[in-house]
Amino acid sequence: MKKIKKLLTAGLFCFTCIAEAQQIQTDRPNETESPAVITTRHIQIESGFSFEKEDDDKTFEVPNAVFRYGVFKNAEIRIESAFKIDHQEQEQHSGIEPLIVGAKYHIANHKGLIPDLALLARVSIPWLADNAFQEPKYSPEIRMLAQHELSKSSHLGYNMGVKWLAETAHPEYIYTLSADHALTKKIKLVAEAYGYAESHHHAQNTADIAVLYVLQKNMQLDIMAGSNIMHSPQQKFVEIGLSYKL
């Protein structure tokens, strides 16, 4: 796992290439994934640091990161990883969570009532992790991503999908709804609600708000805070991140 750690660290801080002029678009910091894909032969690194508290348990991700690469006009491939520190009542675990590999394909552009559409598929690889976080099974996921342009400064996005859980191989259904509004050319506000639901179980619902700040056309800073709602444990979280397009 040392090689993965070295690659992750190098990727987060290797911001020396020149980016193209198009303004950066990211999938972070919220759960709703954008239908936008990375420009061909460009790399985008989306990294962040998060803190989550549920009762007396605390979890840190320092950092989490997504590496996205545009393979051709409408498609990208991606690798996701995170170094996790898990504080429980009488024990602590730390290490790299299972590596996630995937791809996104842009299907249609926004036109009239038809939203921007894309398909995202990814899978977590159980053995590409430190011992404390290895999982018993692969965990594939597929989502349909959509976004409506309400105005030049406002958008409404949503995802629908299913993920097969690593512990049980049972399906877990995913739904997200996100609205954003650009206050200026550099500052955007985002509000979101999302949930996960297994058959015969109450959905785990969450709400969050975020602020995105464009430092340069190819660099974005974000901060997000949220909490579980309704039939969910008392859980609060905060995250700050930096994204860079090469």
Predicted features, each with a name:
Residues 1-27:
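Cleavable N-terminal export/targeting peptides
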Residues 21-246:
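Transmembrane beta-barrel domains of Gram-negative outer membranes and organellar outer membranes
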